[in-house]
Each structure stands twice: as C-alpha cells, then as structure tokens.
C-alpha cells in the first residue's frame, strides 16, 4: 500500500448507544488529533435534516439523505471525527476506522434517566446496549479490520479509549 501524504488525514466514526460516552471521546479526540468533530445529531438539528418527529420516542427522525449530502464534501477532505448513534447508512468508503463505544447497562440507564428519556425510549436504548446492536451493526456494515470496541463507563475508560484511537491513528499514518 502506498504511503499517505503527510497532510492527509483519515475519517473516524465514533458510534454507540446514546449515553455510552461518544461525545466526551469525540471532543477530546478531535482536539488532540486536530480533527473536525462532526456531531450528526447536532448538525441535523441545526440544518433541519429531519423527516418527521417520533412522538412515541420523543425524538426527531433523521433525513439521512440530506445529512449525507451535507457531509459528502467534508468527508472528501478527511480529518473528521464523526459522531452518531447509528452507522449502517454511512458509505463504507467514508471511514478508515469505526469505533463503537459500549457501556454497562446500569451506567447507561443512569445517564439516560439524567437526560429525562421517557420510559419507552430508555428501555429501547438499554435493550440496544444489552444486545450489542450498534456493535453488530458496525460489524455488518464495515470490514472487520476497521471496527473496534471502546469502553465508555468511566473517565479511566475514556482515557484508555482516547489512547487507543491515537495509537490507531499513529499506525494508520505509517501505512
């Protein structure tokens, strides 16, 4: 494989169940690696990339097509840390690494309760974490050698996860 140009940076996806610790990691990883942090939920709200509102789960439903049209030119440049709680609709070509943040369901429950999730939404997200739905989705959507699991329960876990991503980046630059 040819060496990447010195100023070329990969795109990294950080995904996982809401409340697992994605934002904390993304903020620090983007800062330390000098990447752009693209929080897809925030972008969707700001740009109104919403198809409708789901009353049952008390949340907007993402217009994936509009989001992807918006992200395409940014992804072409590289150097992005993309955050979202799903991953199966992003083009595989966009990412050189996919990190899935996981968290024990008891910790996740407490975090989602703090966010005032309704009972149905809370139960759905806890079930998603228990069954490893996002990790399975990532493994089904991307090559296995670019999918990694990170722990998001504690600050110590987060520091280890940040080191893991930074080490991955160092190795990627050597290819």
Curated annotation (Swiss-Prot):
- Signal peptide positions are none
Please name the GO terms of the biological process aspect recorded for this protein, alphabetically. Answer: ribosomal small subunit biogenesis; rRNA processing
Extract the ranges annotated as region (NMPbind).
Answer: 39-62
Q: Which GO terms describe its molecular function?
A: adenylate kinase activity; ATP binding; ATP hydrolysis activity
Primary gene name: Ak6
Describe its function: Broad-specificity nucleoside monophosphate (NMP) kinase that catalyzes the reversible transfer of the terminal phosphate group between nucleoside triphosphates and monophosphates. Also has ATPase activity. Involved in the late cytoplasmic maturation steps of the 40S ribosomal particles, specifically 18S rRNA maturation. While NMP activity is not required for ribosome maturation, ATPase activity is. Associates transiently with small ribosomal subunit protein uS11. ATP hydrolysis breaks the interaction with uS11.
For binding ATP, which residues are annotated in this chain's numbering?
19, 21-24, 115
The species is Drosophila melanogaster
| Annotated EC | 2.7.4.3
Membrane as UniProt keyword = no
Which SUPFAM superfamilies does the record cross-reference, listed alphabetically? P-loop containing nucleoside triphosphate hydrolases
Keywords, ordered alphabetically: ATP-binding, Cytoplasm, Kinase, Nucleotide-binding, Nucleus, Ribosome biogenesis, rRNA processing, Transferase
Catalytic reactions on record: AMP + ATP = 2 ADP; ATP + H2O = ADP + phosphate + H(+)
Instruction: Report the subcellular localization.
Output: Cytoplasm; Nucleus
Q: Which Pfam families match?
A: AAA_18 (PF13238)
**Is the DNA repair keyword given for this protein?**
no
Which principal EC class is assigned to this enzyme?
Answer: transferase
Where does the record place the region LID? 114-124
Q: Which family does it belong to?
A: Belongs to the adenylate kinase family. AK6 subfamily.
InterPro entries, alphabetized: Adenyl_kinase_AK6, P-loop_NTPase
Annotated coiled-coil segments of the chain: none
**What cellular component terms from Gene Ontology apply here?**
cytoplasm; nucleus
Subunit organization: Monomer and homodimer. Interacts with small ribosomal subunit protein uS11. Not a structural component of 43S pre-ribosomes, but transiently interacts with them by binding to uS11.
What protein name is recorded for this chain?
A: Adenylate kinase isoenzyme 6 homolog
């Amino acid at each position: 494989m040819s060496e990447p140009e010195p100023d070329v940076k990969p795109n990294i996806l950080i995904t996982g169940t809401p409340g697992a610790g994605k934002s904390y990691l993304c903020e620090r990883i983007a800062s330390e690696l000098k990447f752009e942090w693209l929080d897809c939920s925030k972008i969707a709200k700001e740009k109104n990339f919403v198809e409708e509102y789901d009353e049952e789960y008390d949340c907007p439903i993402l217009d994936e097509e509009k989001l992807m049209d918006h992200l395409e030119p940014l992804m072409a440049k590289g150097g992005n840390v993309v955050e979202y709680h799903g991953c199966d609709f992003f083009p595989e070509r966009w990412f050189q690494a996919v990190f899935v943040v996981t968290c024990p369901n008891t910790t996740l429950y407490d975090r989602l309760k703090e966010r005032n999730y309704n009972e149905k939404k809370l139960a759905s997200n806890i079930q998603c974490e228990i069954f490893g739905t996002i990790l399975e989705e990532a493994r089904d959507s991307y090559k296995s050698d670019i999918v990694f699991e990170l722990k998001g329960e504690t600050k110590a876990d987060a520091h280890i996860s940040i080191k893991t991503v930074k080490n991955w980046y160092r190795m990627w630059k050597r290819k």
